[in-house]
């Protein structure tokens, strides 16, 4: 299949002109940040609600991701509780990814971190979502036991210009892309699976937490 062109955005892109994004014809889907982290505490991305509504109204396939820095069970529970509240009533056509890159996560062993990520991903699946793991190549190589996460598609960031050899469902290939309707540089990815079709066939994407 021809890779899907996927954009990911958060509060840092400000108010986006979604009509201009759609008219550009350069984007097949959008990953929205649902939760960020401030001083180790999860908080809802202030642009998530608006962007989700705008993409849904325009028929733009949408997925999401949340930033994790949980190193304890209590922190994982707090993140998932905040995520549940933010996702209530939402429907997605792309995966919901766990963003695993925070330096604090390196305090865990690769195996322990993978176990924590797998537990969170399993929770996403109980909510009827297509669970995915996001990280970057060096983190995957040194801090995360990827062999324990093969049940979940990988969204891999690698900006060296060549598609990574590590198996992945999406490749984030730049952080300096440009898309009409958005001020400043943005992250761009290529999805190598037809996630809207996969979610549709499996009946996934309508949050049921």
Predicted regions, residues:
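Flexible, glycine-rich phosphate/dinucleotide-binding loops
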Residues: 39, 71, 140, 163, ...
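Short, solvent-exposed loop/turn segments at secondary-structure junctions
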Residues: 37, 103, 138-139, 161-162, ...
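A short secondary-structure junction signal
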Residues: 109-110, 143-146, 182
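Short beta-strand/turn micro-motifs composed of small residues
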Residues: 66, 135, 158
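Functionally critical loop-and-helix segments that line ligand-binding/catalytic clefts
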Residues: 1-13, 19-20, 24, 147-209
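Aromatic-lined carbohydrate-recognition surfaces of secreted/lumenal glycan-active proteins
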Residues: 127-142
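Substrate-binding cleft of extracellular glycoside hydrolase catalytic domains
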Residues: 1-28, 32-121, 125-130
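Structural recognition of alpha->loop->beta junctions
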Residues: 81-98, 143-167
């Amino acid at each position: 299949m021809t890779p899907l062109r996927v954009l990911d955005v958060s509060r840092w892109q400000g108010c986006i002109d979604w009509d201009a994004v759609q008219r550009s014809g350069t984007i097949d889907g959008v990953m929205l940040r649902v939760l960020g982290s401030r001083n180790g505490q999860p908080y809802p991305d202030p642009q998530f609600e608006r962007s989700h509504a705008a993409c849904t109204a325009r028929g733009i396939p949408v997925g999401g991701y949340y930033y994790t820095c949980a190193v304890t069970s209590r922190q994982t529970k707090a993140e998932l509780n905040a995520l549940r509240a933010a996702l209530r009533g939402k429907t997605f056509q792309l995966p919901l990814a766990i963003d695993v890159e925070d330096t604090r996560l390196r305090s865990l062993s690769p195996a322990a971190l993978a176990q924590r990520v797998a537990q969170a991903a399993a929770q996403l699946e109980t909510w009827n979502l297509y669970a995915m793991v996001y990280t970057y190549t060096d983190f995957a190589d040194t801090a995360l036991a990827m062999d324990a996460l093969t049940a979940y598609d990988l969204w891999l960031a690698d900006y060296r210009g060549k598609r990574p050899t590590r198996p992945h469902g999406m490749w984030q290939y730049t952080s300096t892309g440009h898309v009409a309707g958005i001020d400043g540089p943005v992250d761009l990815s290529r999805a190598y699976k037809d996630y809207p079709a996969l979610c549709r066939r499996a009946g996934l994407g309508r949050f049921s937490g």
